[in-house]
């Protein structure tokens, strides 16, 4: 039995499958030129599988606009997902722009600057 607060292996498997299927559907079914190149980073499911937070990054488009478009199309993507997945409850989808990549780049820049300053002082 899983510990309280831990994510079950079934939850992880379903999250991974949803991520793969959604990535394919966004690329093949939406074909919205305003989206640019969308990459799904992760899917977080609630324990009852009723809701999914889908985190994405985007290239070639404004993140806020891409988030709005994806959330607008969430119902359509949900219906496509329902046809693909063979589970009792297909979660409602909510899309969020993942800013962790930008934060990692910023942190890397700061570390490089600190190292450059330190080497000048030596």
From Swiss-Prot:
UniProt key word Cytoplasm: yes
Cellular-component GO terms for this entry: cytosol
Main location per the UniProt record: cytoplasm
One Pfam family in the UniProt entry: RBFA
Localization annotation: Cytoplasm
Keyword DNA-binding included in the entry's annotation: no
InterPro entries attached to this UniProt entry: KH_dom-like_a/b, RbfA, RbfA_dom_sf
GO biological process: maturation of SSU-rRNA
GO molecular function annotation: ribosomal small subunit binding
Keywords annotated in UniProt: Cytoplasm, Ribosome biogenesis
Reported function: One of several proteins that assist in the late maturation steps of the functional core of the 30S ribosomal subunit. Associates with free 30S ribosomal subunits (but not with 30S subunits that are part of 70S ribosomes or polysomes). Required for efficient processing of 16S rRNA. May interact with the 5'-terminal helix region of 16S rRNA.
Subunit structure: Monomer. Binds 30S ribosomal subunits, but not 50S ribosomal subunits or 70S ribosomes.
Family: Belongs to the RbfA family.
Protein's recorded name: Ribosome-binding factor A
Source lineage: Bacteria, Pseudomonadati, Pseudomonadota, Betaproteobacteria, Burkholderiales
